[in-house]
Every structure is written in C-alpha cells, then in structure tokens.
C-alpha cells in the first residue's frame, strides 16, 4: 500500500518532493522513475503528478532548483569580512565551485550539454531568476569592496571575470580535465601569470592584461 502523504501546503509539498528527487536525478538521470521518487519522498506516486502534473515538469523544476542561487547568496553573505582579500575571495570561489559542481553533476546525468530551457517558466519566474543572479554577483562584489583600492577594476567587473574563470576552470570538459582549485583561480585572477617588476605600469584592461597581470594592483617589489 502506498504511504499517505502528510498534509502540507502546495509549495512545501513541491519542495519536499524536489529535495527527494534531486539526488536520484543526479544518480540516474531521466531513467529514474516517479515510483522511486515517491518512495524516497515517502508519498504516493500520484502525489507527484498532483504537485507537478508530469514527470517532465518535475525534472524542469528540479533543474530550476539547482540553478537557484538563494543558498549561494546566503553562503556568500556569511563569509568572514575580517579575512584578508585573497583568503576572503578563495572562500567565495570555493562556495561558487561547490554550487557549480552540483549543477554540472545534474546536467551530465540528464545528458544536457547546453544551458537548459525552462519551458514551464513564466515571465515572473525569469525575472526572479535574473534578480537572484544579480544579487549573487552583488554579494560577491560586496566581499571585495572593502579592498577595492587594491583592484585595477571595479569589484563588479572583477566578479564577472572571476565568475567566467571559475565556470571554465571548474567544468570538467571546458577545463579539459584540468580543474583548478579555488586558490589557483584566485591567484591567477589577482596576480596573473607574469612576474611583476618595480615600476611596471598596469596592463590594458582586456583579456590579455587580466591574464598577464591579474585584477589586483601590484606594488613595487612584487614578484
């Protein structure tokens, strides 16, 4: 006999089902059955269809949950502001990498090789998603702002560049299997690849300049 679900408000019920479904989707991809998900959630299979309408809608909602940066924003806001700039940024990149790894794992399991389309999203959903992403970037930029005088670019631009680097350096295929650690990403972003000599003027603010000199101002005597 299928278990009878404890009565919950609709949004709480959906959230509980998604919490049970995400690990199964990461492991089995679309091969997972609604019966497996129902058993993991401790509910009757029909409850899934009452909550989401279809398995496809459930999978899409799971992807939307994985892409939701709410937990990322909260984690960034908890980073210790008393840490030095480099250490503070390493923690932020580690948090970002942890989220990216979960997203990549889900997308690989679902055999999705490009950014997913959320067919069931409303314009309000899309606006909220953009707003949340903007808030995540702002939370990261706020971590850098106390030391903005050490940066050659505004914190928002540094976050954008670090974000691009973190994505490509964390993705197992984009990185060619050479995934970088948070420390390596931050050291590259802040200090680049070129040794810095006394009196060296800052490079132009482009991709090459960022790669060679990083985002941080270099004082005399930097090596």
Predicted regions and their residues:
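Alpha-helical DNA-contacting segments of helix-turn-helix folds
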Residues: 25, 59-66
């Amino acid at each position: 006999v299928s278990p009878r679900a404890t009565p919950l408000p609709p949004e709480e019920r959906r959230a509980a089902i998604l919490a049970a479904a995400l690990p199964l989707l990461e492991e089995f991809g679309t091969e997972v059955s609604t019966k497996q998900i129902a058993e993991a959630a401790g509910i009757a299979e029909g409850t899934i269809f009452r909550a989401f309408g279809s398995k496809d809608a459930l999978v899409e909602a799971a992807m939307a949950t994985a892409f939701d940066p709410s937990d990322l924003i909260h984690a960034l806001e908890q980073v210790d502001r008393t840490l030095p700039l480099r250490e503070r940024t390493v923690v932020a990149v580690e948090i970002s990498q942890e989220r990216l790894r979960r997203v990549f794992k889900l997308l690989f399991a679902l055999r999705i090789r490009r950014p997913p389309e959320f067919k069931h999203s409303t314009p309000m959903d899309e606006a909220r998603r953009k707003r949340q992403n903007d808030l995540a970037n702002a939370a990261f930029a706020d971590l850098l702002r106390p030391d903005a005088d050490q940066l050659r670019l505004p914190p928002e631009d540094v976050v954008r560049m670090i974000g691009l680097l973190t994505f490509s350096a964390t993705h197992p295929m984009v990185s060619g299997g050479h995934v970088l650690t948070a420390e390596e990403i931050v050291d590259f972003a802040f200090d680049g690849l070129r040794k810095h000599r006394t009196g060296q003027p800052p490079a132009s603010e482009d991709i090459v300049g960022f790669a060679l000199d990083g985002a941080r101002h270099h004082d005399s005597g930097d090596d």
